[in-house]
């Protein structure tokens, strides 16, 4: 298996630092079969240094804190420099800053991972594609005998889309307030949105 070969960028800069796109893409990654892999720093939305040669731009030190060398090392100098320019400056974007912020990328990462872990269908269920009438809308269902099926629904476009119409009431696992969509009413899909739905 190969990881991070060929792409010289981190995820957040590729997504123009857009949290909606980040959430939709990570929800998609975590709902597909297989073992999820996060590249270090992506759990806090770290940026990259495109001026470094080869793939070194996305291998900069992990940004643990606003301390010297981003809290990564007490050495006088690290092999690769820390990112010190906005919007990915280590002094403002680091684990310590995000640790207690319920709206941070780190909190969203933890929420996605915990929600996935709590659903047997997302961990090891079979995948069945669901047809939609819109090329920008991706839908599939994950099923297992060990728990309820999860309908995964994504709008991968920059404009709202009409969603599918559920046959039963469904709860959105990705809506922190536990939003319920009633049977027979279309689920509206905001731009770059993700939904994990259970009956």
Walk through the language-model features, giving the residues of each.
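Loop/helix patches that line or flank the sugar-binding groove of alpha-linked glycan CAZymes
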Residues: 1-150, 156-161
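A structural detector for beta-sheet-dominated domains
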Residues: 65, 130, 165-168, 190
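Short, flexible beta-strand-to-coil junctions
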Residues: 144-145, 177, 199
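Beta-strand-rich binding/interaction modules
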Residues: 160-177
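C-terminal beta-strand-rich structural cap/linker in extracellular carbohydrate-active enzymes
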Residues: 183-199
């Amino acid at each position: 298996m190969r990881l991070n070969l060929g792409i010289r960028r981190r995820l957040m800069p590729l997504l123009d630092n857009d949290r909606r796109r980040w959430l939709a893409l990570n929800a998609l990654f975590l709902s597909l079969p297989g073992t999820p892999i996060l590249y270090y720093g992506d759990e806090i939305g770290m940026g990259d240094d495109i001026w470094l040669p080869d793939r070194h731009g996305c291998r900069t030190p992990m940004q643990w804190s606003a301390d010297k060398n981003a809290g990564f090392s007490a050495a006088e100098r690290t092999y690769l420099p820390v990112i010190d320019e906005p919007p990915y400056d280590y002094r403002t974007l680091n684990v310590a800053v995000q640790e207690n912020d319920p709206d941070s990328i780190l909190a969203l990462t933890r929420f996605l991972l915990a929600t996935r872990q709590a659903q047997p269908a997302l961990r090891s269920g079979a995948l069945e594609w669901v047809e939609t009438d819109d090329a920008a809308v991706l839908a599939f269902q994950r099923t297992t005998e060990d728990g309820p099926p999860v309908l995964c629904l994504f709008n991968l476009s920059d404009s709202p889309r009409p969603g599918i119409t559920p046959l039963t009431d469904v709860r959105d696992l990705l809506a922190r307030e536990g939003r319920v969509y009633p049977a027979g009413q279309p689920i509206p899909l905001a731009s770059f949105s993700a939904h994990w739905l259970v009956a």
